[in-house]
Design a protein with these regions (language model features):
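Short amphipathic alpha-helical segments, especially helix-boundary/capping motifs
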Residues: 1-2, 13-19, 93-94, 147-152
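An N-terminal, well-structured beta->alpha segment
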Residues: 2-49
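Generic secondary-structure signature for well-ordered alpha-helical cores
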Residues: 22, 26-33, 48, 77, ...
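Glycine-rich phosphate-binding loops that contact phosphosugars or nucleotide phosphates
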Residues: 44, 52-181
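Glycine-rich phosphate/diphosphate-binding loops and the adjacent beta-loop-alpha structural elements
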Residues: 48-58, 196-203
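Internal, active-site/partner-interface "lid" segment
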Residues: 137-140, 179-203
């Protein structure tokens, strides 16, 4: 007997959550901890030396980058997100030698990002890459890089599992940075005087 519409919807929800869980499980089995440590150390060192950090990307990778920049800013870092397409329209003026740019791309072969990698090198900035393609120049030609494995996307094309992997990677980097810089809750709250942060409820 064919499944009802309600059953199909419920199965889709359960299937999606199961796939998300498996995606993170596979991510943890394949990630390289030393890559994460290297990027976190470079971002922390960038702050120590008074340099700026820029995060860039396109599409959903850009959205992940925006969240990372906002979170780092809340912790007192000079971090700014710049959409990949905007660099060649004047945003390059932000850069000074020694600044860092973290480039995020799931495919690792975006034409805009490939062009920017050459541009950033000529500007003598430190480049870091995050992508899901091991052969990508974002992993092989940057000063530091993180491979972000992910499972099959929704409908084989909608960014879903790749976004979960990227967000997990960002959380791991942020956690390592907090440990390196000995950051505490008060450091975050100092930049949130509105005191509107929500504390998790007890289960």
């Amino acid at each position: 007997m064919p499944k009802s519409g309600g059953e199909c919807v419920e199965n889709a929800i359960d299937d999606s959550l199961r796939r998300d869980k498996n995606n993170l499980k596979n991510f943890m089995e394949r990630f390289d901890e030393k890559q994460f440590e290297r990027v976190a150390e470079m971002i922390a060192g960038n702050r120590t030396h008074g340099k700026k950090l820029f995060i860039t990307g396109e599409g959903r990778s850009g959205t992940v980058g925006m969240r990372m920049a906002a979170s780092l800013t809340s912790l007192g870092f000079s971090a700014q997100f710049v959409a990949a397409a905007e660099w060649v329209h004047g945003e390059l003026g932000h850069l000074a030698p020694g600044d860092c740019v973290l480039m995020i791309s799931h495919s690792g072969k975006n034409a805009t990002m490939m062009h920017l990698l050459d541009v950033f090198k000529k500007r003598e900035v430190v480049t870091m890459g995050m992508c899901g393609l091991k052969e990508s120049p974002l992993l092989t030609e940057t000063d530091a890089a993180i491979f972000i494995p992910s499972d099959e996307e929704l409908l084989h094309c909608v960014p879903t599992r790749s976004v979960i992997s990227q967000e997990a990677a960002v959380n791991a980097i942020m956690s390592q940075i907090c440990a390196i810089c000995n950051l505490r809750e008060e450091d975050f709250r100092r930049n949130h005087p509105a005191n509107d942060l929500i504390k998790p409820e007890n289960p």
